[in-house]
Amino acid sequence: MPLSVSVFGTGSFYVLRASGDSMINADIDNGDLIVIKEQKTANIGDIVVAMTDDGKNTLKRLEYDKEAQSYYLHPENPAYEDIYIKEFRVQGVASHVIKAL
């Protein structure tokens, strides 16, 4: 899918389809298209695509636990628990959500 620089800005982007309901409180629903800016770093609070230590990608909010002194991935649905893992790699940061009408 070609993405307009005037809408999305410069950089390398890709689109993925959200699967599941773990991000519903961030207004990301099952089946939504998510525009991801490809980058290896992110800020706390960003919604990121992260590859976990088991090789799977997940879309979650990046947070930091001051007591544990570690980053974790936070689902935006209270039915799911935070993901504390030893290692994960940021694959990109969500920039836009595209919803079907």
Regions found by a protein language model. Give the residues of each.
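Acidic/glycine-rich C-terminal interaction modules and beta/coil loop segments
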Residues: 1-101
